[in-house]
Amino acid sequence: DETTASWLESVGSDPGDWSGLKSDPEAALLEHHIFDAAALEPQVAAPHSPANAAPVGDAPATPVDVAYIGACTGAKYDDLKRAASILRGRHTATGTELMVAPSSRRDQDRAADEGIMKIFEDAGARILPNACGICAGYGADRLGENVTCISSTARNFKGRMGAASSHVWLASPYTVAASAIAGRIADPREFLRAGDEA
């Protein structure tokens, strides 16, 4: 779509003629769905599979020990900007650690230049290096025993982010930021303010 083409151009790539990227007319499709993404409720995926997705309103208000905005899938510049809009002027809940690992140095530098990284720091976040790290269960920040985490990563299989006894919920950066403030799985719409992106 136009949004994708604009992004490709913004990072110096030629989107080419993407208008030709579609299914063959005779392709057999099992089902065809059209969704209005703006009308969808924020989703979370319960442990231990991304397939366990449900509207955030249907999820229990599970307390979270760690809120993680990171990885190549959930900490790009736009993700950081959106999460910061929830966190601006707020602080993480007592007992909940917010960790932020921007997806790339370019995104981190841009976010820093625009004051976004400062919003994370002021909210009590710990900034981690641009690396797979906790997402892949590497390093000192991997999840410990019986830790409950809400994460903007793409996978939440048992033991992927650390100890096999940890529980990882997947969510958007908006939902992760809201949950860091609430100290539990929270609907980000409770925290949006006038002028915030939806």
Describe these PLM feature segments.
Residues 1-198:
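Fe-S-dependent hydro-lyases/dehydratases of central metabolism
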